From Swiss-Prot:
Any Pfam family the entry gives: TT_ORF2-like
Family per record: Belongs to the herpesviridae US1 family.
The organism's place on the tree of life at top rank: Viruses
Gene encoding the protein: US32
Taxonomy of the source species: Viruses, Duplodnaviria, Heunggongvirae, Peploviricota, Herviviricetes
Species annotation: Human cytomegalovirus (strain Merlin)
Name of protein: Protein US32
């Protein structure tokens, strides 16, 4: 049975199909969705396999939000049997004389979604790399170190704390610091 699916939905299904093989050897990604309830998103996974499955489900849910607003990603993933191959509608396009659609290899789609996901996660953690047209760029890129917020240098911490110490030693009231909120 050939059913109509949009191009973005086919891409999303292809990403589900191909990305599952990156972290699990069971060969059937549907089993990881059949047992999914909303409570699985609230409780913390205890084992490494559960963490991988939870991260994969979370990424697939977020990718679903990029192309559909129905908020029911599990139903979209499971409502039809899809084996990773294209439907009969696309094969009939070549026989009818229409130009065939340019297909992007699945690994490129997975790579693009992975890069977008990691860029969103790591946004702000990396500094700006040196310009590529800089003379000696090869040498500069070897020693280039990404800035990580977790690794603060001691002199940065010291210079931030010194004005507070000076104000406090002079008998003033230390300034109120804003509290970091974690989302």
């Amino acid at each position: 049975m050939a059913m109509y699916t949009s191009e973005s939905e086919r891409d999303w299904r292809r990403v589900i199909h191909d990305s599952h093989g990156l972290w699990c050897d069971c060969g059937d990604w549907r089993e990881h969705l059949y047992c999914v309830y909303d409570s699985h998103f609230q409780r913390r996974p205890t084992t490494r396999a559960e963490r991988r499955a939870a991260n994969w489900r979370r990424q697939m849910r977020r990718l679903h939000r990029l192309w559909c607003f129905c908020q029911d990603w599990k139903c979209h993933a499971l409502y039809a049997e899809w084996d990773g191959k294209e439907s009969d509608d696309e094969s009939s396009a070549s026989s009818s004389g229409e130009a065939p659609e340019q297909q992007v290899p699945a690994w490129k789609t997975v790579r693009a979604f992975s890069r977008a996901y990691h860029h969103r996660i790591n946004r702000g953690l990396r500094g700006t790399p040196p310009p590529r047209n800089l003379p000696g760029y090869e040498h500069a890129s070897e020693g280039w170190r990404f800035c990580n917020r977790r690794e603060r240098r001691e002199d940065d911490l010291r210079t931030r704390a010194e004005p507070d110490r000076v104000v406090f030693q002079l008998g003033g009231v230390p300034p109120r610091r804003h509290r970091e909120t974690y989302v």
